[in-house]
Each structure stands twice: as C-alpha cells, then as structure tokens.
C-alpha cells in the first residue's frame, strides 16, 4: 500500500512538473515578443504582450517574474522619455513667458500675496483714479481674467460683453460678486470676469469693440485700441504661463513615476 502511494505521489509530481513546464513554454513566445517590442521602442505593444501572459498563463510563474521585471523597464524607459520631452517643452514655455512678462507690469506684495499678477502698466490703479476702465490680467499660474472698475451708479454686473460692429459678441461671466469701494468723491464697483485666449482673438479680429457691463442694468465701459493691445499681450502671457504650470505638474508626476519604478527595480 505504501509503495502504491509512493508511486502515485511520484507520478502526480511528474505530471505537475510537466504541466508547469508546458505552461512556461506556452507563455515564453509572449515574453519574447514583449522583449522585441521593447527593443523596438514599441512600449504599448510590449505592455500588451506582458498583460497577455498574466491573463492567459497565470501559473507560468517563472515567465511572469521575467515579464514583471521587463514591465518595470518599459515603464521606466517610457517615463524617462516623456520627462525629456516635457523638460524641453517646459524650457520653451518658460522662455516665452519670461519674454512676454517683460512687457507688462508685475504686481505683487510679498507681505500678503503668494501669487503675483501681470497687466499693462497703463492699467495701474494709481494711473486710473476715479476712472472706469477694464484691466486684462493674468496671475503667475496663467489664470486669465479681466477686471472691470466701474465708477458710478450700481450695476451689480454678472456679465462683461464685447460687441463687434457687425453685432456679433462674446460674453464673459463674473467669477464672484462685485466688490464695492466708496470714497468722498464717489463709488467704484470692481468685478472680475473669467477670460480665455479666444476673447482676445475675437477682439483682435475687429477694428472697434464696444464693452458693456450687464447686471441690474447695462452700462458701457471705455475700451480703446490700447486696451485691445493690452488684452492681446496678457492673453499671450496667460497661455505661456498656463502651459508652464501644466508642464511643471506633468514633470513632477513623471519624476514620481521614475522614482517609483527605480525603487521597484532594485
């Protein structure tokens, strides 16, 4: 009885070993294709082959171990390639932003502001006391807005409309409730409006533009050619700063990925 049990156990062991060997043989071509794809810089195809091994041959432990090691190399190479590309784009965006920023006034009080703002020098507050005007501006992250300073009776503005001579127009929504400032000579209503580069394109496509604040009532606000030029300048800078901000975030994420896979490689 003991001999029979021994023979049965031995036979079972041989069967399992043969099965395991067969599974490894079946999985091996997928690993070979994954390695070849990686060598050809076809990272998506390499990952697809590795995923096939996991799905089709979960018990091909040796091949799966090799495939996992290869996957780490694929991910690491892919992340390093992407980071080099991102670094290059970031350098271009930052150089462009630096050039454009030099043409604008930078407003930041480090005592209580973490993020500064760029706008045309002609739109500085001290140059426009008791005036109604529009100030296109962007912060250091590329958040593009247009601030309306309206001197006069309350409007409660919720929309800023730019209208072309042909009647076409574009509306900008207020980002918050108007802020009211009063002094001995009158009242100023300040409202911030969300802007996009498309607004600058619309304005730039027409020789004259009418700017209107819309709220409880409507009121036109001065908008000259010099204001349109300032809008275009700020829009360009906002785009460059926004691109820089997004690329910096991508750069940081890729750095985290690289660190993660380098640690798993050890």
Question: Which stretches of residues belong to each language-model region?
Answer:
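C-terminal motif of bacterial Sec signal peptides marking the signal peptidase cleavage site
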Residues: 15-18
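Short, charge-rich amphipathic alpha-helical segments embedded
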Residues: 44-79
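Alpha-helical linker/edge segments of TPR/alpha-solenoid repeat scaffolds
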Residues: 71-101, 112-113
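An ectodomain-focused feature that recognizes extracytoplasmic/extracellular
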Residues: 94-156
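Mid-length scaffold segments of soluble, non-membrane domains
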Residues: 142-182
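Internal interaction segment
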Residues: 180-200, 208-266
């Amino acid at each position: 009885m003991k001999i029979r049990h021994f023979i049965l156990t031995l036979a079972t062991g041989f069967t399992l070993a043969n099965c395991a060997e067969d599974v490894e043989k079946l999985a091996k071509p997928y690993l070979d294709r994954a390695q070849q794809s990686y060598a050809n810089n076809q990272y998506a195809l390499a990952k697809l082959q590795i995923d096939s091994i996991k799905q089709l041959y979960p018990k091909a432990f040796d091949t799966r171990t090799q495939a996992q090691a290869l996957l780490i190399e694929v991910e690491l190479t892919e992340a390093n390639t992407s980071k080099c590309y991102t670094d290059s784009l970031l350098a271009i965006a930052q150089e462009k932003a630096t050039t454009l920023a030099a043409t604008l006034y930078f407003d930041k009080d480090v005592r209580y502001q973490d993020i500064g703002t760029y706008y045309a020098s002609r739109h500085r507050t001290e140059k426009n006391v008791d005036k109604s005007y529009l100030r296109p501006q962007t912060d250091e992250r590329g958040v593009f807005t247009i601030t309306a300073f309206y001197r006069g009776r309350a409007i409660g503005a919720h929309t800023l409309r730019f209208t072309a001579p042909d009647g076409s127009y574009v509306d900008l929504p207020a980002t918050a409730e108007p802020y009211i400032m009063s002094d001995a000579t009158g009242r100023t209503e300040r409202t911030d409006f969300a802007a996009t580069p498309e607004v600058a394109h619309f304005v730039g496509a027409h020789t004259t533009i009418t700017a209107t604040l819309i709220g409880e009532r409507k009121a036109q606000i001065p908008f000259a050619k010099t204001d349109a030029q300032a809008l275009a300048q700020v829009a360009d800078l906002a785009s460059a700063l926004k691109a820089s901000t997004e690329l910096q975030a991508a750069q940081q994420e890729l750095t985290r990925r690289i660190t993660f896979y380098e640690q798993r490689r050890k």
